[in-house]
């Protein structure tokens, strides 16, 4: 059984999909006016982990993540850079996808852009106008009148807008100050505009997600549009509250059966955000740390809790990943990188565990999945993995040639890779991380000279070269197939 903390009900509850064996999951993607930061990374990793778990358990998952490419900040950026809004959006979408790939985040099944879904937005706004939930102001803006939605505030338990007045545009044009914009009329040469049935303008932020869910994901004849709507906890109010309201008013049903929200990444006690100027951009972090090391760190705190970024904690968490790769090195040749793992292969792996492994391995996978199915209890899951790594190493120390046991370990590692997105590199490449190509070539050259010295029985030179490399933090391992090396 899967349990999750539903943000609407404010408690952990059992998860039951709307339709058997299917899950429709929507995650709010980035507003593409700047590079992605570690807050974006964490949110993407969190819901990538949920998606992997659902897939592992056999669900057919349709995963949608949007790009907001119409926004005040994008317009401002385009003016600053003398570039079109389309150029700004395309550039940062490409940058975002590149960063996510480096972090091992699976691509969404559908990645709609706001600019590609304007007809659906206009259609929903027309429906809201026709039903009397929306009205047009004096400046051609169209607002949702929230007091007509008797369930407004049910998701966030909030009614009052707490943002600054800068977020409340044209307050004098509203019937009530908490009414929010569905459509923003064209304001002049520094604005952008699209044709619509209500004149030139552009959509408000909230209507974008509702319209894209209706087009790409929603069930049309169910009590709820989709199974799960997810995003950062900063989106709960007003964004998700407003999404829920306008969809409810337009369609007569709730937008989602369950709501999931992840916690912030904090730097010096403040939420990481572009507007605060404390963003640790992913592209900058990747210059220092490999994406898998960042992923391993960011998934290590329960998804609903705030993560206080600390490089000491990051380096400490890397030791956990080192231990995983060292066990992998004992059972898989160092140059072999994991292939893309399918569910059928996972089924075969688990079958092998039941058929050939010791009792400890039989219970590993079920214990791991049970922990993850409990509102993604990552602390318990990592403890289970740590126990498996330690137990496996202890057993192999005494029984280094037990092939059946090694096969079971391979299966365990493959399941960890599928579920957590960790351990997919070859051990050789993992233990050589952080070195540029020039340095690697210099190391390989010294190793070749050492091999030549050994062939000529010049053991003094061979030992000297080994010592030189060791002083540089490089350890050489001699095997029947030749010499390999890793960064200590």
Curated annotation (Swiss-Prot):
A motif ('HIGH' region) lies at residues 30-40. GO terms for molecular function: ATP binding; cysteine-tRNA ligase activity; zinc ion binding. The keyword Nucleus does not apply. Zn(2+) binds at residues 28, 209, 239, 243. Its cofactor is Zn(2+). It comes from the Bacteria. It holds the Pfam family tRNA-synt_1e. Its EC number is 6.1.1.16. ATP binds at residue 274. Belongs to the class-I aminoacyl-tRNA synthetase family. This is Cysteine--tRNA ligase. It comes from Helicobacter hepaticus (strain ATCC 51449 / 3B1).
